[in-house]
Design a protein with these regions (language model features):
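Transmembrane beta-strands of outer-membrane beta-barrel pores
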Residues: 23-25, 39-45, 130-132, 139-145, ...
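Conserved small-residue
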Residues: 7-13, 17, 24-116
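Extracytoplasmic loops and strand-loop junctions of Gram-negative outer membrane beta-barrel proteins
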Residues: 2-5, 20-22, 103-112, 162-164, ...
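Hydrophobic, lipid-facing positions within transmembrane beta-strands of outer-membrane proteins
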Residues: 15-21, 120-126, 133, 209-214
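Outer-membrane beta-barrel proteins
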Residues: 4, 30-32, 44-50, 90, ...
Length: 226
């Protein structure tokens, strides 16, 4: 018998704004300064999802895709709350915001409200020329995106001790003489790694210099003599 069927349902709304701009701030015979900007802003949300209804909040949702009114691929996680100084176990928040070492993954996960795709991205830079000398730059940026850091998560995996290279941050792990720390115990018998959470959910915003170049253009008269 058929218990489920795939269907193309739901609506993804995208509200975009794109900008491309180049402006000459200075322009004369000897000097030219041009600023350029390229950018995109995207606001998306889901609607008309005929899926599961959260028994607590009543929200319509598809775990892994999103919920009505939220961004696509929104994270749905148990919230990580640090380390229990008494025993080194991981601490979490239940749905009501109470601390617990043993969250229920069926009832204590909450929607993050964060985007896993950029809200804004683009580049900007300037071109400066003065009597043949020039400087050119470009910066790239991404804003409004949070994603799980799988690489760092793997480097902090205590089950890989003595098998693979791991992060030096594990040296800060909880011990009876190091109780105030942000790294849980690595001792067996703890709850570390037992629960999926947003512990390694990381803001991925960045501003990076893509390139910078400096040079000199030989005058045409000089080139004609070569």
């Amino acid at each position: 018998s058929v218990t489920s069927i795939n269907a193309n349902t739901g609506t993804l709304h995208n509200n975009d704004f794109d900008l491309e701009l180049a402006y000459d701030i200075i322009r004369n015979n000897d000097m030219k300064l041009t600023v350029n900007v390229v950018g995109n802003v995207n606001d998306n949300y889901l609607d008309d999802l005929p899926a599961d209804v959260d028994p607590v909040t009543g929200e319509v949702q598809i775990v892994g895709i999103g919920r009505n009114g939220g961004p696509i691929f929104e994270r749905f996680d148990v919230r990580y709350a640090g380390v229990n100084p008494a025993n080194g176990n991981e601490l979490f928040l239940d749905r009501d915001g109470n601390l617990t070492e043993n969250p229920n993954p069926d009832t204590d996960r909450v929607w993050s409200g964060l985007n896993t795709t950029p809200e804004a991205q683009g580049s900007f830079g300037f071109n400066f020329d003065y009597k043949g000398f020039f400087i050119q730059t470009q910066f790239n940026y991404v804003l409004g995106v949070d994603q799980l850091d799988f690489d760092y998560s793997a480097l902090m995996d205590v089950t890989s001790i003595s098998q693979f290279n791991l992060s030096a941050d594990l040296l800060r792990s909880w011990t009876p003489t190091n109780r105030i720390t942000d790294v849980p115990t690595i001792q067996p018998g703890s709850n570390v790694g037992n629960f999926a959470s947003n512990r390694f959910l990381t803001n991925k915003d960045f501003l990076r210099l893509r390139f910078a170049s400096v040079g000199y253009n030989l005058p045409k008269k000089t080139l004609d003599k070569i």
